[in-house]
Curated annotation (Swiss-Prot):
Entry's localization field: Mitochondrion inner membrane
Protein name: Cytochrome c oxidase subunit 3
Keywords: Membrane, Mitochondrion, Mitochondrion inner membrane, Translocase, Transmembrane, Transmembrane helix
Principal location: mitochondrion
Family membership noted in the UniProt record: Belongs to the cytochrome c oxidase subunit 3 family.
Mitochondrial matrix topological intervals: 1-15, 67-72, 153-155, 224-232
Recorded GO CC terms: mitochondrial inner membrane; respiratory chain complex IV
Membrane topology: Multi-pass membrane protein
Reactions the enzyme catalyzes: 4 Fe(II)-[cytochrome c] + O2 + 8 H(+)(in) = 4 Fe(III)-[cytochrome c] + 2 H2O + 4 H(+)(out)
One BP annotation, GO: mitochondrial electron transport, cytochrome c to oxygen
C-alpha cells in the first residue's frame, strides 16, 4: 500500500481460479461417473483438489487482509457486494427446487395417483426429527447473533463460546439429517417425490456443511486474534451465510415436510 495512491487492492496473479475451475470439472465428471459406473476415483480427486485450492486461496486472502492491510474500506465494500450477490444466486438456486416441488405437488399427474404425496409414498412425520432440526437451526441462529454482538463489544471469550455452540449445533443438524436419510422409507429414485425431497434437503444439507466449515475457519482465526470490532468481514460473511441457511430451512420445513406430507 506504500506505493499506491488509491484505496483499491490490485491482486497479484494467482493460480487458484484455474485450479478451482479444474477441480469443479473433476467433481462434476466424478459425480456422473459415480452415479453411472459406481466409480469414485474422479470424484475423490476432484474433492481433494477442491479442498487444496480452497485452503490455499483463502490462506492468500487472509494474508492480504490481516497481515498486509490490503482490505481497505473500499475493498471491504466490494467484498460485501460480492457476498450479497452470491447469496442472491443461492436464493435463485433454491427457488428452482421449490418451483419443481410445487409444480409437481399442486397438480399431481395421474401417474402419481392424482394425489400428493404420491400413492405408495409414506412421508416423514414433520413433528419428529424435522421439528428437532428446525429448533436446532433456530438456536444456532441465536448463538451466531450472540457471537456477532460479543465481537462488536470486544468480548473475545463470549464470541468464541457462541461460535463453538453454533458449530456444534451445525454438526448436530448434519448428523440428524444423515440419520433421517438413512431411515427414510423412500429413496431419491422413488419418482418426483423422492427426487424433489432429496435434492432440495440434500442441497440445503450441503450448505450447512459449507457454513459449518466457514464458521470453523472463523473460530480458528479468532483464536489467533484475527478479528477486531471494526475489521471482521470474514466472520460477518459467515454469519450472513448461516442466517440464509436458517431461513431456507424454514421454507423447506413448511413446504416439503409439513405441507407436503
Amino acid at each position: 500500500m506504500t506505493h499506491q495512491t488509491h484505496a483499491y487492492h490490485m491482486v497479484n496473479p494467482s493460480p487458484w481460479p484455474l485450479t478451482g475451475a479444474l477441480s469443479a470439472l473433476l467433481m462434476t465428471s466424478g459425480l456422473t461417473m459415480w452415479f453411472h459406473f459406481n466409480s469414485m476415483t474422479l470424484l475423490t480427486l476432484g474433492l481433494t483438489t477442491n479442498m487444496l485450492t480452497m485452503y490455499q486461496w483463502w490462506r492468500d486472502i487472509i494474508r492480504e487482509s490481516t497481515f498486509q492491510g490490503h482490505h481497505t474500506p473500499n475493498v471491504q465494500k466490494g467484498l460485501r457486494y460480492g457476498m450479497i450477490l452470491f447469496i442472491i444466486s443461492e436464493v435463485l438456486f433454491f427457488t428452482g427446487f421449490f418451483w419443481a416441488f410445487y409444480h409437481s405437488s399442486l397438480a399431481p399427474t395421474p401417474e402419481l395417483g392424482g394425489c400428493w404425496p404420491p400413492t405408495g409414498i409414506h412421508p416423514l412425520n414433520p413433528l419428529e426429527v424435522p421439528l428437532l432440526n428446525t429448533s436446532v437451526l433456530l438456536a444456532s441462529g441465536v448463538s451466531i447473533t450472540w457471537a456477532h454482538h460479543s465481537l462488536m463489544e470486544g468480548n473475545r471469550n463470549h464470541m468464541l463460546q457462541a461460535l463453538f455452540i453454533t458449530i456444534s449445533l451445525g454438526v448436530y443438524f448434519t448428523l440428524l439429517q444423515a440419520s433421517e436419510y438413512y431411515e427414510a422409507p423412500f429413496t431419491i429414485s422413488d419418482g418426483v417425490y423422492g427426487s424433489t425431497f432429496f435434492v432440495a434437503t440434500g442441497f440445503h444439507g450441503l450448505h450447512v456443511i459449507i457454513g459449518s466449515t466457514f464458521l470453523i475457519v472463523c473460530f480458528f482465526r479468532q483464536l489467533k486474534f484475527h478479528f477486531t470490532s471494526n475489521h471482521h468481514f470474514g466472520f460477518e460473511a459467515a454469519a450472513w451465510y448461516w442466517h440464509f441457511v436458517d431461513v431456507v430451512w424454514l421454507f423447506l420445513y413448511v413446504s416439503i415436510y409439513w405441507w407436503g406430507s
